[in-house]
Amino acid sequence: MKIYSKLAALAISAFVMVSCAQAQQTETRKPGHFTKVHSGGSWEVILTEGNTEEIRIEAKGVDLDKVKTEIDGDVLKLGLVNGNYRNVSLKFYVTYTDLEGLRCSGSGEMHVESDVIAEDFYIGLSGSGDVYMKNLRADELDASISGSAKIKIQSGSVGEAEISQSGSGDFVAEDLSIEELEVSKSGSGDTFVGDLGEISVRSSGSGDVVYSGSPRMGDIKVSGSSSIRKR
């Protein structure tokens, strides 16, 4: 009977440990000041503007002490401590006071739910992750996509924009007006933008550039089956 009792106790303890590991854990952190956010992994990041910098973490399948929220210069880095992880569900709710750039590597998603106003804004994607923005107003935009990642901007206006694409990733911003646009692309990724003042394109592969308005045509060099056309 004692053996059975010990086995039962061990089974209960193991069940409790597994249940705790699978339960959702929540923590709020004050990381310090940052203006850019880098997410590297398969999780979701939701960003909103506020009066103070703050991160709320929702984690399932991983201990919170394995979740990294580090400041490197003016960059907030989100991720996990090096290790082997399975069945991890992780979500970051980031509150910022000033936002100047986003970087996403891996298969995660970043959602900016507030309007963003900036002098210079940078978006860099590699892998299959996506960035979604509600509204962007900036003097200059530098956007880089590699792999199958996608950038989607619902609306806004930009003075000068440089968009670099390699692979099958798309840049989708049909209601984003741009005074001067320069596109450099290879592969099958498409570029959709709004009203343009001037456009320059260097494209190889099958990716298209689709725009609105009647822009001045700058330096246009196209090879492959790519097309540049008005919507």
Regions found by a protein language model. Give the residues of each.
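Intrinsically disordered, low-complexity terminal regions
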Residues: 1-231
